[in-house]
């Protein structure tokens, strides 16, 4: 199938075409660039929500219940779920099938797991492009779910319009999230497993941390703290409504355009960096016996060597 045909099929709502395009993105297939170029004008209208937080807090269960509510409104949903990568295959270990299984047969839901491929951020390198492909395919909502790697979670902010930080009572997650800098990017706090005896205490702890931040208090949007149960769906309707309120706030304040401009800038920098790193690696592989030998023999320092490589890139 040609790239043009693949693009046309995706834009017409072909699920198999979407799956193939995302595979090309994830494998960094050279053809992916031309495809994204054709799809990009068809993006930018979907609601995008990022879910982040430590492993085991129930992000997937919350997302699954949220999807149910969107589907009741006949909205199409795309989910990009980033899993830890196998060190051998660089593929997603956990996979789609373990989570969100109830939505697999729903034609209005497209779930894709992507391996982190050693990426330092919480999101895989191609996850934002996968989200763009889903938008072009026609989803109304794109959900990004991170794997919970600590400080790198801040990358989710550049991919989503609204960031939901999911925490669990009785684990000290909020303190760890604060240390990692994740608290600063959250637009909504979600205390999941709210039937836990320490749920109210966890919410109070988050509130105390937020009250300390003077910068947050001065912002027009102060992050609300919601209580949910991913297993029963309790509190998910309120979460959905709060996400929509935040989207309305972003649009009315002009912040949505600012966020998206920043996100586009970061995406350009990210992929320029990936390409530059690849070209430099190829150059080193070609000239290892020459350039690197001089470095090994202390005839050339690493900084000067890198400058020589840059001259050729």
PLM feature segments, named:
Residues 188, 194-249:
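Canonical P-loop GTPase G-domain recognition
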Residues 227, 238-313:
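Long, well-ordered amphipathic alpha-helical subdomains in the mid-to-C-terminal portions
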Residues 152, 178, 235:
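Short acidic active-site motifs
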Residues 2-49, 57, 66-152, 159-166, ...:
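Nucleotide-state-sensitive switch-loop elements of NTP-binding domains
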Residues 113-114, 165-168, 190-193, 227-228:
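Conserved beta-strand segments of the P-loop GTPase G domain that flank and frequently precede/overlap
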Residues 62:
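Hydrophobic positions on the alpha1 helix immediately C-terminal to the Walker A/P-loop
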Residues 54:
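P-loop (Walker A) phosphate-binding loop of NTP-binding proteins
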């Amino acid at each position: 199938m040609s790239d043009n045909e693949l693009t046309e099929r995706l834009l017409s709502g072909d699920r198999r075409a979407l799956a193939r395009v995302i595979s090309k993105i994830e494998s960094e297939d050279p053809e992916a660039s031309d495809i994204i170029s054709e799809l990009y004008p068809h993006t930018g209208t979907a609601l995008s929500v990022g879910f982040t937080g430590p492993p085991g807090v129930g992000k997937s269960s919350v997302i699954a219940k949220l999807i149910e509510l969107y589907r009741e409104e006949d909205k199409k949903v795309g989910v990009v779920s980033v899993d830890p990568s196998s060190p051998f295959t660089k593929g997603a270990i956990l996979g789609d099938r373990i989570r969100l299984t109830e939505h697999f047969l729903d034609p209005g839901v497209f779930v894709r797991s992507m391996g982190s491929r050693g990426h330092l951020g919480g999101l895989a390198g191609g996850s934002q492009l996968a989200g763009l492909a889903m938008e072009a395919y026609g989803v109304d909502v794109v959900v990004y779910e991170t794997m919970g790697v600590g400080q790198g979670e801040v990358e989710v902010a550049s991919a989503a319009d609204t960031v939901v930080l999911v925490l669990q009572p009785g684990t000290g997650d909020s303190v760890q999230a604060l240390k990692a800098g994740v608290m600063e990017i959250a637009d909504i706090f979600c205390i999941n497993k709210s039937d836990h005896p320490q749920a109210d205490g966890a919410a109070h702890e988050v509130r105390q941390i937020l009250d300390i931040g003077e910068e947050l208090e001065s912002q027009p949007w102060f992050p609300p703290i919601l209580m949910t149960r991913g297993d029963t769906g309790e509190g998910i309707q309120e979460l959905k409504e709060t996400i929509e309120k935040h989207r309305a706030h972003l649009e009315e304040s002009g912040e949505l355009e600012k966020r998206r401009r920043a996100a586009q800038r970061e995406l350009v920098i990210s992929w320029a960096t990936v390409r530059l790193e690849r070209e430099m690696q190829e150059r080193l592989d070609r000239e290892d016996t020459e350039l690197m030998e001089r470095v090994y023999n202390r005839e050339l320092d690493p900084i000067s060597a890198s400058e020589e490589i840059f001259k050729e890139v």
